[in-house]
From Swiss-Prot:
Gene source species: Vitis vinifera
Known catalytic reactions: L-glutamate + NH4(+) + ATP = L-glutamine + ADP + phosphate + H(+)
Localisation: Cytoplasm
EC top class, as a word: ligase
UniProt keyword Cytoplasm, yes or no: yes
Protein name listed in UniProt: Glutamine synthetase cytosolic isozyme 2
Gene Ontology cellular component annotations, sorted alphabetically: cytoplasm
Residue ranges occupied by any GS beta-grasp domain in the UniProt entry: 19-99
Pfam families in the record: Gln-synt_C, Gln-synt_N
């Protein structure tokens, strides 16, 4: 095993200029991540200078067997925390050979929204709080829980420490450092209310980069849990009963909101989000109705309400934002399995481009 570890950690730059590029894309479920690697002749820093590639879409549920080729378009580059050196991770989106985005390519439409002049002028900032649950591989039950049983009630686990309260911290810290190494603007981590559940935050990130960074952060997490022999779940309500669900609260601001007088802009934006509540809920993740019950720090899925410092609201405004008269707000509706390309671009579209 020591030899295997030595080989995995070989520093290729000592002997060659060639690098390994791991191409990442979203699979047919819209939530599963896939990747494969290729050798390049030397370091690359501009994704548009990377070659396009293809894969068998019939094996990912994205193309029929008789016409199975799907084309990968490189869109964002990150340093590879697994191979290190000059090796890279490449976030791609997916197209037909004719150049049309396939149905699971949500990045394409998001990029169009974020390139709109009105949206560009507002410099949209996002901070996404990604919650997830770590499961025992053999039984798909949260780590730290007795198999077939339950731990003590919620209360001591949120930001808790100790072997009886925090389960999987080595995975969480490994992920934190790996994301920083990769160049992802990960801003923090914490243990969540349900034992075995954790959160990391990505942001502030501008426009389309929020989606790129969150997807690659998810990819890195899945790779680390693969090594650890643990399963990561993004199910919005992995355990039924008196246990918190898992969300992806999305913090948002525009230049107008961050400037003096921005609180009035925030209130107008929230009003527009309320008018499109059903459309947003439909796009905010599968199974969200199991999470948005009006309990466990959520608003009921059929009700739109906002408030200052209210974690039972659809939209929460922070005390500092109210006091300073400018800042940001938090959309608490997105589920943990949401597509960040969809959520971030839809918030921008509804608050900037959409006219009631």
């Amino acid at each position: 095993m020591a030899l295997l570890s030595d080989l995995i950690n070989l520093n290729l730059s000592d002997v060659t200029e060639k690098i390994i590029a791991e191409y990442i894309w979203i699979g047919g479920s819209g939530m599963d991540l896939r990747s494969k690697a290729r050798t390049l002749s030397g370091p690359v820093s501009d994704p548009h200078k990377l070659p396009k590639w293809n894969y068998d879409g019939s094996s990912t549920g994205q193309a029929p067997g008789e016409d199975s080729e799907v084309i990968l378009y490189p869109q964002a580059i990150f340093k590879d925390p697994f191979r290190r050196g000059n090796n890279i991770l490449v976030m791609c989106d997916t197209y037909t050979p004719a150049g049309e985005p396939i149905p699971t390519n949500k990045r394409h439409n998001a990029a169009k929204i974020f390139s709109h002049p009105e949206v560009l002028a507002e410099e949209t900032w996002y901070g996404i709080e990604q919650e997830y649950t770590l499961l025992q591989n053999s039984v798909k039950w949260p780590i730290g829980w007795p198999v077939g049983g339950y731990p003590g009630p919620q209360g001591p686990y949120y930001c808790g420490i100790g072997a009886d309260k925090a389960f999987g911290r080595d995975i969480v810290d490994s992920h934190y450092k790996a994301c920083l190494y990769a160049g992802i603007n990960i801003s923090g981590i914490n243990g969540e209310v349900m034992p075995g559940q954790w959160e990391f935050q990505v942001g502030p990130a501008v426009g389309i980069s929020a989606g790129d960074e969150l997807w690659v952060a998810r990819y890195i997490l899945e790779r680390i849990t693969e090594i650890a022999g643990v399963v990561v779940s993004f199910d919005p309500k992995p355990i039924q009963g008196d246990w918190n669900g898992a969300g992806a609260h999305t913090n948002y601001s525009t230049k107008s909101m961050r400037n003096d007088g921005g609180y009035e802009i925030i209130k107008k934006a929230i009003e527009k989000l309320g008018l499109r509540h059903k459309e947003h809920i439909a796009a905010y993740g599968e199974g969200n109705e199991r999470r948005l019950t009006g309990r466990h720090e959520t608003a009921d899925i059929n009700t739109f309400l906002w408030g200052v410092a209210n974690r039972g609201a659809s939209i929460r405004v922070g005390r500092d934002t109210e006091k300073e008269g400018k800042g940001y707000f938090e959309d608490r509706r997105p589920a943990s399995n949401m597509d960040p390309y969809v959520v971030t671009s839809m918030i921008a579209e509804s608050t900037i481009l959409w006219k009631p």
